[in-house]
């Protein structure tokens, strides 16, 4: 079911979300949450979404990136749920992308993040998995996982002159790489 997106200013986006238990993964509530996340992500046009963004303060985020996306980056990550994720920074060299967020509609901001990360998480069955990622996918992972810890991309913009409305971004900003 498509849910309304919680926007910046809603306190749920500023809380650390609750870890879930393995028993929870067997519940109807969990299955429904996954459907709601996917429906809401697709409807609102995101490449990832975290549970707090649809009003559920649980440590669950989903990401789906296939082929060349509209940001000109080729990344392949089939629909994946990251449950109770932990992030490890493998290469602290930073890279910057213009980011956007369903919870901060109409804006774009240039954010520098670690170039390479390793995420350890539970899959849908509660089995531990890990994923190493670099480049654009590393940024997407950091953006989505930040949502589980009360952080928005705007918090990570170092130079606020690089925060722009979408229309002005389209008109004045040369860099094409950005994410929703
Ligand atoms: Zn976001």
Predicted regions, residues:
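Positively charged
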Residues: 1-180
């Amino acid at each position: 079911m498509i849910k309304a997106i919680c926007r910046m200013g809603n306190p749920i986006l500023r809380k650390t979300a609750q870890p879930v238990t393995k028993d929870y993964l067997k519940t109807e509530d969990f299955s429904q949450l996954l459907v709601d996340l996917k429906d809401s992500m697709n409807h609102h046009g995101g490449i990832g979404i975290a549970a707090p963004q649809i009003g559920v303060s649980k440590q669950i985020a989903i990401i789906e990136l296939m082929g060349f996306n509209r940001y000109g980056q080729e990344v392949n990550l089939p629909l994946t749920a990251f449950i109770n994720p932990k992030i490890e920074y493998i290469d602290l060299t930073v890279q910057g992308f213009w980011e956007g967020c369903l919870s901060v509609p109409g804006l774009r901001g240039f954010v520098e993040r670690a170039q390479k990360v390793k995420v350890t998480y539970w899959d849908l069955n509660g089995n531990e998995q890990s994923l190493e990622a670099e480049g654009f996918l590393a940024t997407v992972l950091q953006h989505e996982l930040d949502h589980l810890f009360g952080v928005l991309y705007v918090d990570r913009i170092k130079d606020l002159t690089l925060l722009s409305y979408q229309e002005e971004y389209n008109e004045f900003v040369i860099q094409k790489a950005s994410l929703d």
